[in-house]
Amino acid sequence: QAPTDADLLSVLIEDAQAGHDPRVVLALHTAPVDLDPFSEEAIRAANPAFGDFQNAAETLAMAEDARRMPSREPEYRNLILNQRVDMNAPFVSQRVWQECGAPVVDDFRGLPVFGGLDLSEVSDLTALVLVAPVDGVWHVKPTFWLPGQGLADKARADRVPYDLWARDGWLQTAPGRTVDYEYVAAHLRDLCETHDVRKIGFDRWNWRHLKPWLAKVGFADDQLEGDAAIFEQMGQGFESMSPALRDLESALLNKRIAHGRHPVLESCARNATVQTDSAGNRKLSKSKSHGRIDGMVALAMAMSAAGTWEGAAVIDHMAMIG
């Protein structure tokens, strides 16, 4: 079926079910909503060819993936169970997220480092997430910034304990009412001087504001743009984010992520849902208006940047052979 009630196919099915035109015969194979959606019974109800020319093992594997990863469940229900469903879903289940909560190594120096930078408006949460490979697992090290002035008020407005996170060192506060791009640029300069930073993906929307500050703190032109640039622009729409989410999702499902249960990043993971377009491409969106997902957007960009590294294929192979 089509995903929503407004789709033409949905309208045609409902018209046929109502019997308005006696010349139309409807044969609809769909899994009843009261069945376990991941059971073989539900699959067989929607797929008369299951086990015949429809590969049973592949279909059952899709069911298991959808059970473990909520972001895949709407597509599974729509395409395999032939159900009409809301195509927005949580990106990652708490169980899968917690399974990847192993401690993170203290120091990324000496390792190839990749990053994702989600630049906010100057008064909102800004996130830089770094990933580095350690024994076949991508270790995750996030940094979050908010303006220090008015932090308690923002915590009340967003219903998020920013002030407590800042007190405990999980959140960095910038002086004043804004997180100035100069402040972020200086942090990136220090990072690149002390670490082997290969690539940092970032939202192209605010590049025009950040680029002058990066040049001012000492980044060369060829580090900012061109084939050898450290910084790589990434769009935030369906076309750009869908491959990045696929890489991140694969790493989470195969336990090739170690995030250390960072509370700010974990809050972003809980807030992140997946929005799907008509072509099946996906991007992250917020589950509620006051929730923040900046850390997950930055993590997805970091994993996308890491995919350009020649050693990433070795990690993928290690996951396949288990």
Feature roles, as predicted:
Residues 194-211:
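Short glycine-rich phosphate-binding loop at a beta-alpha junction
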Residues 2-8, 124-127, 208-216, 242-246:
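A short acidic (Asp/Glu
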